């Protein structure tokens, strides 16, 4: 054990195990998660290849092998609970992306959300056992987030009771679905439904694409891999082109919308019900943002405690770089953000499950807010985490650029989350559309609930966006209640500014669509402020529920840092709205520096509480034992370029050149 890390852990003011229990949901969850992890670590069949030294084809093969072995092992161990499956995958796959992942994360959830009982009986078991390997084919070469623009067609033929699927243009070719290129034999395809001469918009169809047994593409199907990408090298993101490809009528998922044998269309109770899979995945991505940022913080903070560099006082030993205030200012707000996102991720998961249960009973009242909140928080958390992961890499100096640090892989694996499952700016605008509807309802005298209830204060003119918001007392920068109120006022103010600017453009005889575009920057700002308020509120609401006083104190410091750092970064919004004064902003910045000092003794213990195994981190710099330099040298020796003392290229190219000089 590195002596600096040993000292760091000894200096902590709390027991990290107690925070681990909170993050896992309970001590029992922690016990069970570790039990599952130990099954993997003690299994002789488990092998962990260093993906950094593999070709793309090798990475894909290893990932497929891992996926197949993982399914067999989960059956062997009797692991079927969704949360336990997630724990198993995280350690078993380590830092590999799973080619069969969309079978479990999108194909099966879509069957559950949109399939009839008969359809679930037909396809669920085979897909759970990987007889059917499914993917989710929505995105096309020419359209992604703009679902109404998708061009793939499914035309119903009542004579044969079949749908005829076509990719009518080059831009209509399905493009990007994970596992589509080489792995999947089925896809849930989103296509424009045409029956009796009318187009009824996007619907989901279960489409066999490869023959089971031979795995060859079926007639009418053209399918393959889209090529190398920024990351995800072991994932076979693919393309799919369909030419007059016929599937039975029963392959349309018909839990909500239906097509009768004669071609009659029966519309769903709500069009938004078909977006269930997207909402599910977006709610999951919030938690994934927390996980990825937590990994990067763990690596950067542990390494910063081990790395010694430069000097603070002359003639004294080189200090740990974690002692530099600038390093703390880079990393501790990100650590606070990781914790904030953990809590909001759990909140979103619980909210999704609760509302989904209500939807199953026919209550759709909370669906619009769920759709808006998952879209906005998906964008807010992934943007923030993406930038934070890169900040952690740079905080590791030159070694952070090496794949040995683990952070480059975390970054390239996470960064597509900013554009898949909904491009983030478009997601923010979807949230804004909901906020504008709520704003109109409030202005007409209706009281609203949920996370937008703060807009109920608008008619009383307590918030005056173009002038001064009435602030009854000075903001107490040590009061989480007061800081939450400040974020609430900022959100309300920016929502009202966007709404009034939108109305101004409409009153100038602009169409609603043109007015929306001309207001879109304000609308995104309003959505961002709303999401920021939700995160602050969820984090601060969590603290009173924590029993242990030492744990509560350290998490309170993180919550204060998260809230104050956000005010510092968005100071213009708070100043323009007269929510805080210039003098208070100076106090905020001073208090942030005080909090860095308070958090410093607990920094390593706070990342230890995430309880990542070294295998999951995949980092030489972030090792639990802190023995960085010895292992960095050993890691470098594994490079394929080191297999020979003299590379063959020397004899082929350099030696002939040198002999002529």
Swiss-Prot record:
Transmembrane stretches, start-end: none
Known pathway: Lipid metabolism; peroxisomal fatty acid beta-oxidation
Regions annotated as coiled coil: none
Keyword Oxidoreductase listed: yes
Protein name: Peroxisomal acyl-coenzyme A oxidase 1
Function as written in the Swiss-Prot or TrEMBL entry: Involved in the initial and rate-limiting step of peroxisomal beta-oxidation of straight-chain saturated and unsaturated very-long-chain fatty acids. Catalyzes the desaturation of fatty acyl-CoAs such as palmitoyl-CoA (hexadecanoyl-CoA) to 2-trans-enoyl-CoAs ((2E)-enoyl-CoAs) such as (2E)-hexadecenoyl-CoA, and donates electrons directly to molecular oxygen (O(2)), thereby producing hydrogen peroxide (H(2)O(2)).
Matches recorded under CDD domains: AXO (cd01150)
Residues the entry annotates as binding FAD: 139, 178
Known partners and oligomeric status: Homodimer. The enzyme contains three components A, B and C, the latter two being produced from the first by a proteolytic cleavage. Interacts with LONP2.
Motif segment (Microbody targeting signal): 659-661
Subcellular compartments: Peroxisome
Family according to the record: Belongs to the acyl-CoA oxidase family.
Major location category of this protein: other
Positions marked as site (Cleavage): 468-469
A molecular function (GO) term: flavin adenine dinucleotide binding
Active-site residues annotated for this sequence: 421
Gene Ontology cellular-component annotations: cytoplasm; peroxisomal matrix; peroxisomal membrane; peroxisome
Keyword rRNA-binding: no
Modified-residue entries (N6-acetyllysine), positions: 65, 216, 255, 267, 272, 437, 446, 500, 512, 637, 652
Tissue: Expressed in Schwann cells. Expressed (at protein level) in liver.
Enzyme class: oxidoreductase
């Amino acid at each position: 054990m590195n002596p600096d890390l040993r000292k760091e852990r000894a200096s902590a003011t709390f027991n990290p195990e107690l925070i681990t229990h909170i993050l896992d949901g309970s001590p029992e969850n922690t016990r069970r998660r570790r039990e599952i992890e130990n099954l993997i670590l003690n299994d002789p069949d488990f092998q962990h290849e260093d993906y950094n030294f593999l070709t793309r084809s090798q990475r894909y093969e290893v990932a497929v092998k891992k996926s197949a072995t993982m399914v067999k092992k989960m059956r062997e161990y009797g692991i079927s609970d969704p949360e336990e499956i997630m724990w198993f995958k995280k350690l078993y796959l380590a830092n590999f992306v799973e080619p069969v992942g969309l079978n479990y994360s999108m194909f099966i959830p879509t069957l559950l959300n949109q399939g009839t009982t008969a359809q679930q009986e037909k396809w669920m078991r085979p897909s759970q056992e990987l007889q059917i390997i499914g993917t989710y084919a929505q995105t096309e070469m020419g359209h992604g987030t703009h679902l109404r623009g998708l061009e793939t067609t499914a035309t119903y033929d009542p004579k044969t009771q079949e749908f005829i699927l076509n990719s009518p243009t080059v831009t209509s070719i399905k493009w990007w679905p994970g596992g589509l290129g080489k792995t999947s034999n089925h896809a849930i395809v989103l296509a424009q439904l045409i029956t009796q001469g009318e187009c009824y918009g996007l619907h989901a169809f279960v489409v066999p694409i490869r023959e089971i047994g031979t795995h060859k593409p079926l007639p009418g199907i053209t399918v393959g891999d889209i090529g190398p990408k920024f990351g995800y090298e072991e994932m076979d993101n693919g393309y799919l082109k369909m030419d007059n490809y016929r599937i039975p009528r029963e392959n349309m998922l018909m839990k909500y919308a239906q097509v009768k044998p004669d071609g009659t269309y029966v519309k769903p109770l709500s069009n938004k019900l078909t977006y269930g899979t997207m909402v599910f995945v977006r709610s999951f991505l919030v938690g994934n943002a927390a996980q990825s940022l937590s990994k990067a913080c763990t690596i950067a903070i542990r390494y910063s405690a081990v790395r010694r560099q430069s000097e603070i006082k002359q003639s004294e030993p080189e200090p740990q770089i974690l002692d530099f205030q600038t390093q703390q200012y880079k990393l501790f707000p990100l650590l606070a953000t990781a914790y904030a996102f953990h809590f909001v991720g759990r909140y979103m998961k619980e909210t999704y499950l609760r509302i989904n249960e209500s939807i199953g009973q026919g209550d759709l009242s909370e669906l619009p807010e769920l759709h808006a909140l998952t879209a906005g928080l998906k964008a807010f958390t992934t943007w923030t985490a993406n930038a934070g992961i890169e900040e952690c890499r740079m905080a590791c100096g030159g070694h952070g650029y090496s794949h040995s640090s683990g952070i480059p892989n975390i970054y390239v694996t996470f960064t597509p989350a900013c554009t898949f499952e909904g491009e983030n700016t478009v997601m923010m605008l979807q949230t804004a559309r909901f906020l504008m509807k709520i704003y109109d309802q409030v202005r007409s005298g209706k009281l609203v609930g949920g996370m937008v209830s703060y807009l109920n204060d608008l008619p009383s003119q307590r918030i005056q966006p173009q002038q001064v918001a009435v602030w009854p007392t000075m903001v107490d920068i040590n009061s989480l209640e007061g800081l939450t109120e400040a974020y609430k006022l900022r959100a309300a103010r920016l929502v009202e500014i966007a709404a009034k600017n939108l109305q101004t453009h409409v009153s100038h005889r602009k169409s609603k669509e043109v007015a929306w575009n001309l207001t879109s920057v304000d609308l995104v700002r309003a959505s961002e402020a709303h999401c920021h308020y939700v995160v602050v509120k969820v984090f601060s609401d969590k603290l009173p529920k924590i029993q242990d006083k030492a744990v509560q104190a350290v998490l309170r410091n993180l919550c204060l840092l998260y809230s104050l750092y956000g005010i510092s970064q968005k100071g213009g919004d708070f100043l323009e709205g007269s929510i805080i004064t210039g003098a208070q902003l100076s106090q905020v910045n001073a208090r942030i520096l005080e909090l860095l000092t308070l958090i410093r003794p607990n920094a390593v213990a706070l990342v230890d509480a995430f309880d990542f195994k070294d295998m999951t981190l995949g980092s030489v710099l972030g090792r639990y034992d802190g023995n960085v330099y010895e292992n960095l040298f050993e890691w470098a020796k594994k490079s394929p370029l080191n297999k020979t003392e003299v590379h063959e290229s020397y004899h082929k190219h350099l030696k002939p050149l040198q002999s002529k000089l």
